[in-house]
């Protein structure tokens, strides 16, 4: 059963940002760079109108409404990325062995984690920059998903299994996402 006669989600395009829609591809160009993404769902139309990106569907079902709002959120994140960018902050925590972290090419190398001889590695996705400042790691970029995945890769590289995590709290943890502190 359709939920309504139609759904129409609008995303405002701010000044200095150019959005072009070609078929299912949406390109967003701004002062920090350019992002391109494909959005496809049967029956959903995406177009620009009066300085807005419009996501439209006739006689939507519940799933169609959810997908239309998801597309709108992704486009909002693309616009925010090319205007402001996204920043994640991670903190290096250790009590037993001092951890050393360095960036080498498209990988983050974590050495001496829990006294291990072999270094652990975390992949940096394309379009993301990683800076190490003492015990703080800053991950920046314009694509929210790539920045978040890179931060998660770094955090997961130091995940401890089979040991009591209440005692062995060494690792690298995300402490701030997009300017908002993470509480534990």
Swiss-Prot record:
Keyword field contains Chaperone: no
Highest taxon above the source species: Archaea
A GO molecular-function descriptor: rRNA binding
Gene Ontology CC: cytosolic large ribosomal subunit
PROSITE patterns linked to this entry: RIBOSOMAL_L6_2
GO biological process: cytoplasmic translation
Keywords, in A-Z order: Ribonucleoprotein, Ribosomal protein, RNA-binding, rRNA-binding
One of the Pfam families matching this protein, by short name: Ribosomal_L6
Record-linked InterPro entries: Ribosomal_uL6-like, Ribosomal_uL6-like_a/b-dom_sf, Ribosomal_uL6_a/b-dom, Ribosomal_uL6_arc, Ribosomal_uL6_CS2
NCBIfam families: PRK05518.1, uL6_arch
Record-stated family: Belongs to the universal ribosomal protein uL6 family.
Its biological purpose: This protein binds to the 23S rRNA, and is important in its secondary structure. It is located near the subunit interface in the base of the L7/L12 stalk, and near the tRNA binding site of the peptidyltransferase center.
Subunit structure: Part of the 50S ribosomal subunit.
Protein name as annotated: Large ribosomal subunit protein uL6
The organism of origin for this protein: Pyrococcus furiosus (strain ATCC 43587 / DSM 3638 / JCM 8422 / Vc1)
